[in-house]
């Protein structure tokens, strides 16, 4: 072989196994809450289960992990596929930037665990790369504790193979949320600080194993309910076909969740919230935008929303096109949301109703108050999560 050819091979060997871009198509599905609404079933009280997200915050010292969020996934709307084991056992998961652990149902789940019976289950005996761990784990949700034990195996995402990933095998899943869920489990993509049992999060393993060229991942969430794919998770870069213009960046202010500083929330009719600035979390695991209850009530009034039941607000469907623009200021840049973008249309018992995409949620100090920017915000704005620079970038979706 010519010396030049040998040099090329040597350079390739030195570069290592880095992949260019890993594309994971996301499927959009009807959230559990909306599905229950459409069939007229009882919806768990939002206040009783702290609405869409509840945080067990009393942040620990920096040397200690922050206590895990208390969270439910009644409003999750996007999932993708991963594999666990060799050969890969397939699971659908919510890629959640609001938590840090990976878990899927276990073949050892309790006989009466209906959620487990209805979903794919991991079977260690069928994997040649399984390594026993056995540590018990529990994640506390508003409806109870999801519990099980830890195991270690290879996780496949696209054409990436992430070795030695510790994950949870769930043997008990609480409440109706996971029974009705279209997804099998959760893949957390937040920082190690909030990882239960100090497990190394999935994306941290990707970084440590140098599997991608840039330690970033990005989300495109298609808000058109009839379009496919429902969205895309991209590891290692961004996809220009989904956005226009340059990214505007904001620094992460607390490396636990993807938490950033928000300058203000402005309604076109003159109302300003988050005066003087506030903290916000960018969270792909929930669909709504939440904020302190008192402020969100003012916001609902300003957009003409009326209280319905259990924390939900209804808006007259024929007024959507004339609703005031709501502008979130981040890093000195305005991010506008129109009525078409912050209102959901839901079919309920043969009738169509329109629900506000905002919800009240009080997160106590020292962690709060907080705003949560879910899919209502991420949908119109292509979002990049950058671990190299601990920042979040936004660009307008096309």
Curated annotation (Swiss-Prot):
<dbReference type="InterPro" id="IPR021109">
    <property type="entry name" value="Peptidase_aspartic_dom_sf"/>
</dbReference>
<keyword id="KW-0645">Protease</keyword>
<dbReference type="InterPro" id="IPR033121">
    <property type="entry name" value="PEPTIDASE_A1"/>
</dbReference>
<dbReference type="GO" id="GO:0031904">
    <property type="term" value="C:endosome lumen"/>
</dbReference>
<dbReference type="GO" id="GO:0005764">
    <property type="term" value="C:lysosome"/>
</dbReference>
<feature type="glycosylation site" description="N-linked (GlcNAc...) asparagine">
    <location>
        <position position="133"/>
    </location>
</feature>
<keyword id="KW-0458">Lysosome</keyword>
<dbReference type="Pfam" id="PF00026">
    <property type="entry name" value="Asp"/>
</dbReference>
<dbReference type="GO" id="GO:0000045">
    <property type="term" value="P:autophagosome assembly"/>
</dbReference>
<feature type="disulfide bond">
    <location>
        <begin position="317"/>
        <end position="354"/>
    </location>
</feature>
<dbReference type="GO" id="GO:0097194">
    <property type="term" value="P:execution phase of apoptosis"/>
</dbReference>
<comment type="subunit">
    <text>Consists of a light chain and a heavy chain.</text>
</comment>
<dbReference type="GO" id="GO:0005765">
    <property type="term" value="C:lysosomal membrane"/>
</dbReference>
<dbReference type="GO" id="GO:0004190">
    <property type="term" value="F:aspartic-type endopeptidase activity"/>
</dbReference>
<keyword id="KW-0732">Signal</keyword>
<feature type="disulfide bond">
    <location>
        <begin position="109"/>
        <end position="116"/>
    </location>
</feature>
<keyword id="KW-0378">Hydrolase</keyword>
<dbReference type="GO" id="GO:0045121">
    <property type="term" value="C:membrane raft"/>
</dbReference>
<keyword id="KW-0325">Glycoprotein</keyword>
<dbReference type="GO" id="GO:0038020">
    <property type="term" value="P:insulin receptor recycling"/>
</dbReference>
<dbReference type="GO" id="GO:1901143">
    <property type="term" value="P:insulin catabolic process"/>
</dbReference>
<protein>
    <recommendedName>
        <fullName>Cathepsin D</fullName>
        <ecNumber>3.4.23.5</ecNumber>
    </recommendedName>
</protein>
<dbReference type="GO" id="GO:0043065">
    <property type="term" value="P:positive regulation of apoptotic process"/>
</dbReference>
<dbReference type="GO" id="GO:0042159">
    <property type="term" value="P:lipoprotein catabolic process"/>
</dbReference>
<comment type="function">
    <text>Acid protease active in intracellular protein breakdown. In chicken it is a key enzyme for yolk formation as it is capable of catalyzing intra oocytic break down of protein components of both vitellogenin and VLDL.</text>
</comment>
<dbReference type="GO" id="GO:0005829">
    <property type="term" value="C:cytosol"/>
</dbReference>
<dbReference type="GO" id="GO:0006508">
    <property type="term" value="P:proteolysis"/>
</dbReference>
<feature type="disulfide bond">
    <location>
        <begin position="274"/>
        <end position="278"/>
    </location>
</feature>
<keyword id="KW-0865">Zymogen</keyword>
<comment type="similarity">
    <text>Belongs to the peptidase A1 family.</text>
</comment>
<dbReference type="GO" id="GO:0060561">
    <property type="term" value="P:apoptotic process involved in morphogenesis"/>
</dbReference>
<feature type="signal peptide">
    <location>
        <begin position="1"/>
        <end position="20"/>
    </location>
</feature>
<feature type="active site">
    <location>
        <position position="96"/>
    </location>
</feature>
<keyword id="KW-1015">Disulfide bond</keyword>
<dbReference type="InterPro" id="IPR033144">
    <property type="entry name" value="Cathepsin_D"/>
</dbReference>
<dbReference type="GO" id="GO:0010008">
    <property type="term" value="C:endosome membrane"/>
</dbReference>
<dbReference type="InterPro" id="IPR001461">
    <property type="entry name" value="Aspartic_peptidase_A1"/>
</dbReference>
<feature type="active site">
    <location>
        <position position="283"/>
    </location>
</feature>
<keyword id="KW-0064">Aspartyl protease</keyword>
<dbReference type="GO" id="GO:0070201">
    <property type="term" value="P:regulation of establishment of protein localization"/>
</dbReference>
<feature type="propeptide" description="Activation peptide">
    <location>
        <begin position="21"/>
        <end position="63"/>
    </location>
</feature>
<dbReference type="InterPro" id="IPR001969">
    <property type="entry name" value="Aspartic_peptidase_AS"/>
</dbReference>
